[in-house]
């Protein structure tokens, strides 16, 4: 049976991550409180941020910025804002 967590992002019980994906205390907090589904949502936002803002993961300041955005997204309910990005509308 899959491990479940009370996901702080989705506000519901959901399947948890298989293992700790991020180092340190923040990684433990993510592992204990963020679901697989919420993590996948973050990964797509993270990819957009890296590409649109041309972040370099070798740069400490860029990594710090990305970590701040991750905490804001997963734990504080703040969406990632990317200048000029317009979400695709679902065709009805």
From Swiss-Prot:
The entry's keywords: Iron
GO molecular function: iron ion binding
Keyword Iron assigned: yes
GO cellular component terms attached to this protein's record: cytosol
Entry-linked InterPro entries: Fe_traffick_prot_YggX, Fe_traffick_prot_YggX_sf
Coiled coil: none
GO annotation (BP), single: cellular response to oxidative stress
HAMAP family: Fe_traffic_YggX (MF_00686)
Family: Belongs to the Fe(2+)-trafficking protein family.
Function: Could be a mediator in iron transactions between iron acquisition and iron-requiring processes, such as synthesis and/or repair of Fe-S clusters in biosynthetic enzymes.
NCBIfam families registered for this protein in UniProt: PRK05408.1
Protein's UniProt name: Probable Fe(2+)-trafficking protein
Protein source organism: Shewanella halifaxensis (strain HAW-EB4)
């Amino acid at each position: 049976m899959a491990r479940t967590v009370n996901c702080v992002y989705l506000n519901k019980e959901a399947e948890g991550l298989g293992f700790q994906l991020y180092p340190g205390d923040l990684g433990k907090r993510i592992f204990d409180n963020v679901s697989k589904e919420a993590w996948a949502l973050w990964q797509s936002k993270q990819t957009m941020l890296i590409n649109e803002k041309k972040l370099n993961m070798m740069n400490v300041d860029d990594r710090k910025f990305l970590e701040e955005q991750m905490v804001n997204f997963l734990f504080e309910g703040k969406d990632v804002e990317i200048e000029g990005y317009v979400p695709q509308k679902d065709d009805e």
